[in-house]
Amino acid sequence: MLSLKKYLTEGLLQFTILLSLIGVRVDVDTYLTSQLPPLREIILGPSSAYTQTQFHNLRNTLDGYGIHPKSIDLDNYFTARRLLSQVRALDRFQVPTTEVNAWLVHRDPEGSVSGSQPNSGLALESSSGLQDVTGPDNGVRESETEQGFGEDLEDLGAVAPPVSGDLTKEDIDLIDILWRQDIDLGAGREVFDYSHRQKEQDVEKELRDGGEQDTWAGEGAEALARNLLVDGETGESFPAQVPSGEDQTALSLEECLRLLEATCPFGENAEFPADISSITEAVPSESEPPALQNNLLSPLLTGTESPFDLEQQWQDLMSIMEMQAMEVNTSASEILYSAPPGDPLSTNYSLAPNTPINQNVSLHQASLGGCSQDFLLFSPEVESLPVASSSTLLPLAPSNSTSLNSTFGSTNLTGLFFPPQLNGTANDTAGPELPDPLGGLLDEAMLDEISLMDLAIEEGFNPVQASQLEEEFDSDSGLSLDSSHSPSSLSSSEGSSSSSSSSSSSSSSASSSASSSFSEEGAVGYSSDSETLDLEEAEGAVGYQPEYSKFCRMSYQDPAQLSCLPYLEHVGHNHTYNMAPSALDSADLPPPSALKKGSKEKQADFLDKQMSRDEHRARAMKIPFTNDKIINLPVEEFNELLSKYQLSEAQLSLIRDIRRRGKNKMAAQNCRKRKLDTILNLERDVEDLQRDKARLLREKVEFLRSLRQMKQKVQSLYQEVFGRLRDENGRPYSPSQYALQYAGDGSVLLIPRTMADQQARRQERKPKDRRK
């Protein structure tokens, strides 16, 4: 087999090279079907890529197809698979594709036109653009190709010399197969065809003559080289007919530019930061003459009006439109260019997209004042933002308001309209800028927005109710005693007149064990006002301490708790949003030693916050013993403790108030415990009853099943006994006239059906009479 293959291939190669020098080209389609499977096997060789098929179903040719066993399209012709695919495609809407077949009509050099051969080797299948296409997209591309070439293809003459009459069709097809393999290996027709090399010399001569006559110089030659198309099979070069600017029916580049300027004006104010290293282009205004409006592509267009093809023009147009999505590099060492107002050349465009556009944009100002008709994300008054120079920040809305409780309900618009890389309030530092993919998600502005969401939008809460709700979180008695959330239900204790009880957060300080009797102080005068703490020392320069929102789980926790964690000691936030970029250096982070010291102080402040209001008062009054002793000691020990110290009247009054409130809280805890025990006992009783009910239902089902089985057995026994009974003549009794009756002693009697029916009716009347 190997020797035969080697012998055939060597001879065919020599024969093919000889014919390819003549210029004969053949079609490979006839050898890719089932006409000559042995020759195809010799050419392709046994390969596992062609044998991964279902060999038990190779001869399933009910639909009329004859496929070679090594064909790669064999799976598509299996009858079962094809029918199954058709059934599955019934529930999908499919647009039928338009098949367009195009053949190159050529003629001999003498002028005789050869007829088109649909199934012969003239059907071009290479990637040169003149190909047999199938599908709507390829059909459009083919029509454009035919429109672009037009009559030039007819003027070129024959693509191939006439086929010699000495060669058969099989020889020509085999030569074409091997010649295509040469093309795949990189040896085109230009290696063998002398006429092709002569044509290339003629084309180069025409180019040199045209360069002397025209003013194109280098650009004209490049444009003409772009317009020369090379056929991948024949290797011939032919110029593509480019529609001129006068008779071009599609949109020209100037019209597209005017349309682009009308829709996306590059107006008086630049939308991008200026860059002195970028290419300076004159941006036309409406008052300038139309001649200046074509200068937008000055770096891309040549100095003269060189003829561009349509594809090149659209590429240039798309490069301009991509300038709106480019990224601009900004660093602290860049020197930016700013021109005086009114200068038409004051706008510079950077063509290097690297980093996001709004690097220092204050995104806290992105919440608009109202949703009116002038609702614009980017207002026309957008100003360019220099990074290193001192200037105002980029305004994103006509109303430069920093109020976060505006018409939009303090919704952060930056998360809605900006991508994550734009949604960042980056503070310029001296270090290098590192990419932060989570910068937009964990943005400080977004976290502040979440924490600032007013509770008034859910269930009518106001800040007063929110503060009461915070007190009830840690209060031991404010949750289960039917405490109301209305402002009128706010009760006050004896110490509510203190100045430190206005804005507060609650913390529990009472013990959960009741170890003493309540003979002296009972549960009278109980108040739901829990122990609270001032936030005035925690406000500081920040000003307002927001309520912690219910919508974000992280916002339930006090931010002061997070600051005392060891792995967050190095985290520092710069909240100087409305400062100029030049003033950001003064707001840098403190050194690590200061951070550690600050974290210890914050931890101490956090411990102070955990103390109740009574503990703060006791510490302020310098009471010598703790609140736990005041509340939990029995009466005798408590009196002895008071007698050991010389206390003033104010101190004694505060101690009694603390003990009374603590006893009331412990009594409320015991009351809640009793109620909870009662509820738990009822719950256990209900569960026991439910278990008993389920057990009884199961027993009932079992009894009904056994009763049904007994009835079936009795019925079968009844039919068996009745079928064996015979009269005097030996004939069986009729079931419609006679019936069996069971006696109380176990005997069975045969009675007429009428008497049995009467007895059954009497038995049915007895329960009815008893009910009456």
Swiss-Prot record:
PROSITE patterns: BZIP, BZIP_BASIC. GO terms for biological process: anatomical structure morphogenesis; cellular homeostasis; cellular response to cholesterol; cellular response to cold; cellular response to copper ion; cholesterol homeostasis; cholesterol metabolic process; cysteine transport. One of its GO terms (cellular component) is cytosol. Changing residue 599 to A: Impaired interaction with CEBPB. The keyword RNA-binding does not apply. Residues 654-717 form the bZIP domain. InterPro entries: bZIP (IPR004827), bZIP_Maf (IPR004826), NFE2-like (IPR047167), TF_DNA-bd_sf (IPR008917). Residues 108-148, 470-532, 582-613 are annotated as: Disordered. Glycans are attached at residues 348, 360, 412, 423. Residues 682-696 are annotated as: Leucine-zipper. Residues 113-131 have a biased composition (Polar residues). Residues 476-523 have a biased composition (Low complexity). The cholesterol recognition/amino acid consensus (CRAC) region directly binds cholesterol, as well as campesterol and 27-hydroxycholesterol. Has much lower affinity for epicholesterol. Interacts with KEAP1. This is Endoplasmic reticulum membrane sensor NFE2L1. The gene is NFE2L1.
